[in-house]
Amino acid sequence: MVVAVYPGTFDPLTRGHEDLVRRASSIFDTLVVGVADSRNKKPFFTLEERLDIAHEVLGHYPNVQVMSFKGLLKDFVRTNNARVIVRGLRAVSDFEYEFQMAGMNRYLLPDVETMFMTPSDQYQFISGTIVREIAQLGGDVSKFVFPSVEKWLTEKVAAMDPASGASAGQP
């Protein structure tokens, strides 16, 4: 049984992420979607919200598990007995960083492979950062995220404090 881990911040989970999950889940016996805590990135959604979103969007895949992780990816990979790390590459600009990370992961986990997947054509330009920016500026993100994610974005943006730009209830 081959287990793969697809790690990410998923802030928010986009149609591009789901496309990769759909395709990777057809290759591996189990695909573990690891939602990274990523506090240093100051995510728009809390870890709990990102987990809820991922469960809503990906819950219908029978061989996909969604869980959070903190700390080093290598520890999460080992905990889940994974043999493969799945990463998405949208553009050449992604490759340099991902290539360095794959090299480090190979050093830390010599028996684990990194598999790069490119998105389907219609999702090559989608990123969580761009989706968040469009949503915060009142734009239509319905082509980039699932309806449930669009609802999460709309509610989160509405809860923003216009005076400070910070989310309500957060510093």
Curated annotation (Swiss-Prot):
Residue positions annotated to bind substrate are 9, 41, 73, 87
Where on this chain does ATP bind?
9-10, 17, 88-90, 98, 123-129
The protein's matches in InterPro entries, at most eight in alphabetical order, are given as:
Cyt_trans-like, PPAT, Rossmann-like_a/b/a_fold
Q: Where in the cell is it found?
A: Cytoplasm
Residue stretches in coiled coil: none
The reaction(s) this protein catalyses: (R)-4'-phosphopantetheine + ATP + H(+) = 3'-dephospho-CoA + diphosphate
The biological pathway it contributes to is: Cofactor biosynthesis; coenzyme A biosynthesis; CoA from (R)-pantothenate: step 4/5
Annotated function: Reversibly transfers an adenylyl group from ATP to 4'-phosphopantetheine, yielding dephospho-CoA (dPCoA) and pyrophosphate.
Q: Where does the protein principally reside?
A: cytoplasm
Keyword Magnesium among record annotations: yes
Q: NCBIfam families recorded for this chain?
A: coaD_prev_kdtB (TIGR01510), cyt_tran_rel (TIGR00125)
Family from the record:
Belongs to the bacterial CoaD family.
- This chain belongs to which protein, by name? Phosphopantetheine adenylyltransferase
Cofactor(s) annotated in UniProt? Mg(2+)
The processes (GO biological process) annotated in the record are: coenzyme A biosynthetic process
Transport as UniProt keyword: no
Q: What GO cellular component is one of the record's annotations?
A: cytoplasm
Q: What is its EC number?
A: 2.7.7.3
